[in-house]
Regions:
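Small-residue-mediated transmembrane helix hinge/kink sites in multi-pass secondary transporters
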Residues: 59, 117, 143-144, 204, ...
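Structural motif at transmembrane-helix junctions in multi-pass transporters
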Residues: 64-70, 115-131, 208-214, 262-284
Length: 329
């Protein structure tokens, strides 16, 4: 259900949304801080905003000639370092109770990154973006198949509104080039969405059984190790990257890391993959807003001023805001 009450038997009592404890760097008040109702959904909302800004940095770096493979490598390595804060028992931290599933989650995360870049590089961005947003519906469908009691009719409606909203936000003007590689774009984007959906549900399920600290840090570390294979694909060495591009890539990778830390933490701790993904789906809306608000600082001139495009973006924004409202109700 979406009102904060949980009936799922795999959820430990200590993780009940009405008595959740969170680290003081997320919510002030120290140990034992309670999180009322659906306040935890502010975490994926923050992640969506940070992702929108971070993506501007990564796109600006790409415009300066930085390979997207370099961006993936840096983001995954920085994320692996950041996730070490969740480990317990230093200097000999607790290890996963089940190594194979955790390594599998790392592989899913890595493959999702690769497929996303391929869909955006070799496909049509205006098609890839809304299809990638279908991750919301895939997560809801997977949870329904697995018998998660939190999936309701409202969840399905909110998920559908999110995908529709992202699709409307991506509609281009009349002068936009015709779509190309449509089937390839859809297949790559769906594959990426499925990988990330599997990762989200896996983190939620394994964290409920073994603890977030024994799952996510090792899964992200696995993705970082796999990312070493991307270095030969980079078009230049790090020291050859222009100073301006380095600034953009560090801003982008840093913010993408921070948003991933918040998002994955919320998935593993609050056990609401459907609601969290619906709220996180607002990143498309925030992306449009950030291009308008600060895009010029990143050399971004994407935003169309065509009235026909503007009305579709207003409709898309309303869909996403409605979806978020349904989740918070």
């Amino acid at each position: 259900m979406l009102d904060g009450r949980r009936s799922n038997s795999i959820l430990p009592t200590s993780l009940s949304p009405n008595s959740l404890t969170t680290p003081p760097f997320f919510f002030h008040g120290g140990h034992g801080t309670t999180v009322p109702d659906n306040l935890y959904l502010l975490l994926p909302l923050t992640s969506a905003i940070l992702y929108a800004i971070g993506s501007l940095g990564l796109r600006a770096a790409a415009q300066e000639g930085v390979s997207p493979w370099r961006s993936i490598f840096m983001a995954n390595v920085i994320s692996a370092a950041a996730f070490q804060i969740y480990l317990r028992g230093w200097p000999t931290p607790e290890v996963p109770a089940e190594w194979l599933p955790v390594l599998g989650l790392g592989l899913l995360f890595f493959c999702g990154n690769i497929l996303t870049v391929l869909s955006l590089t070799y496909g049509d961005v205006s098609i890839a973006t809304p299809v990638l947003a279908a991750k919301v519906v895939i997560v809801v469908a997977m949870l329904a198949v697995l018998g998660d009691g939190n999936v309701t009719g409202t969840t399905w409606v909110a998920g559908g509104l999110t995908v529709a909203g992202v699709g409307l936000l991506q509609i281009q003007g009349k002068n936009h080039p015709r779509h190309h590689h449509v089937l390839l774009t859809i297949l790559l984007s769906l594959a990426a969405s499925t990988c990330f959906a599997g990762f989200d549900i896996g983190v939620q399920s394994l964290s409920a059984r073994h603890g977030f600290h024994r799952v996510a840090p090792y899964a992200i570390l696995t993705a970082a190790v796999l990312s070493l294979a991307l270095l030969p694909l980079c078009n230049m060495r790090y020291r050859e990257i222009p100073t301006k591009a380095k600034r953009f890539i560090w801003i982008g990778a840093g913010l993408v890391t921070l948003q991933a830390t918040l998002l994955i933490y919320s998935l593993g701790t609050f056990q609401d993959a459907a609601g969290i993904n619906i709220v996180y789906g607002s990143r498309g809306l925030w992306g449009i807003f950030m291009v308008w608000a600060i895009g010029k600082h990143f050399g971004n001139r994407e935003l169309q001023t065509n009235r026909g495009v503007f009305k579709f973006r207003i409709a898309g924004a309303l869909c996403i805001v409605t979806a978020i409202g349904l989740v918070f109700m």
